[in-house]
UniProtKB/Swiss-Prot annotation:
The gene is alc2. This is Probable allantoicase 2. It catalyses: allantoate + H2O = (S)-ureidoglycolate + urea. It holds the Pfam family Allantoicase. The lineage of its organism: Bacteria, Pseudomonadati, Pseudomonadota, Betaproteobacteria, Burkholderiales. It comes from the Bacteria.
Length: 336
């Protein structure tokens, strides 16, 4: 589940929420009006776009993204994408990296809700991102303010051209009424709706990666901080998918061997109201869910009997002492 190092100038939604258009989680490019120069699937590749000088194929210069032919008629090109999970979109990244003389002058995104794999012809599409001016070889971050959960997107290029990557950052929606009473659910799973509130340092990898499914693919697939040269410790705050009583915790240091944290601890609380900034301040004083525990390299560390009985909580702060990398974090709990 490796993910690119994030643009340090990218907005907060890129670090907080999951990419609903990630094919590793089930997203799929279903149909494109044209993909002559480069297939639609490349647009969803989770890795950063690359440029390979001198690489050509039967259709011309090989480009890492979705690229249509030059349109000689009226109209515009489009691509329909099924999201990995139905979700509320908070922001998108329309990335034209390496497309310089062949990027679309503008793009927009429509959205719909459909139970079908491919939306029917009579699907009702709504504007999610209005027509937005694009430039070549750069990220275009667009905030979205729409509380509705969608299943499919339609990316429109005006009139044609290439889009290196599409990232759709949002919070998946799950039907919690189907969860059995007493069932243990991963309350830290990003696919269940958990998200990263804040982290004090993400030099080598975003803390939100800890919430991704599966085990890390490599050392680059996790949260890793820079080497701490001053007193203190590093930390990350997670908003749980739902309020719950945490029964089991897993801290996975997969692939972190010379750079795993020496110890970890957890603080937790049930929080109502406030802002992310206020949570960061409050979290310093939350009660301990788990006292300091030693960690080892490249291992899953499970804690059950060591957990304090705090009752239902909504947020957890992971402290790593003094610094290092954590691949995955699981909070198995019962819904409150």
């Amino acid at each position: 589940m490796a993910a690119p190092i994030l643009d340090p100038n990218a907005p907060a939604f890129t670090r907080r929420y999951m990419n609903l258009a990630d094919p590793r989680l089930g997203a799929k490019a279903l149909f494109a009006s044209d993909e002559f120069f480069a297939p639609k699937e490349r647009m969803l590749d989770p890795e950063p776009a690359v440029f390979i000088p001198g690489k050509y194929d039967d259709h011309g210069k090989w480009m890492d993204g979705w690229e249509t032919r030059r349109k000689r008629t009226t109209g515009h090109d489009f691509c329909v994408v099924r999201l990995a999970r139905p979700g509320v979109v908070y922001g998108v990244d329309l990335d034209t990296s390496h497309f310089t003389g062949n990027f679309p002058p503008a793009a927009s995104i429509d959205a719909c809700v459909s139970d079908a794999d491919t939306p029917p012809d009579d699907a009702v599409w709504e504007t999610l991102v209005p027509a937005t001016t694009l430039a070549g070889n750069q990220h275009h971050y667009v905030d979205v303010s729409n509380p509705r959960a969608y299943t499919h997107l339609r990316v429109n290029l005006y009139p044609d051209g290439g889009l290196a990557r599409l990232r759709v950052y949002g919070q998946p929606q799950r039907d919690w009424s189907r969860a059995a009473r007493g069932e243990l659910v991963d309350l830290a799973a990003i696919e269940n709706g958990a998200y990263l509130v804040a982290a004090n340092n993400e030099h080598f990898g975003p803390a939100s990666r800890m919430l991704m499914p599966g085990r890390g693919a490599n050392m680059g697939d996790g949260w890793e901080t820079r080497r701490r040269r001053e007193p203190g410790n590093d930390w990350a705050i997670v908003a749980l998918a739902r309020p719950g009583v945490i029964r089991r915790v897993e801290v996975d240091t997969a692939h972190f061997k010379g750079n795993f944290p020496d110890r970890c601890s957890l603080q937790a609380a049930r929080v109502a109201g406030g802002t992310d900034a206020s949570l960061v301040t409050q979290a310093m004083f939350w009660p301990m869910l788990l006292g300091e525990q030693p960690l080892g390299m490249d291992s899953v560390h499970t804690f059950e009997t060591q957990l304090a009985a705090l009752g239902p909580v909504t947020h957890v702060r992971l402290n790593i002492h003094p610094d290092g990398g954590v691949s995955r974090l699981r909070f198995w709990g019962e819904l409150a």
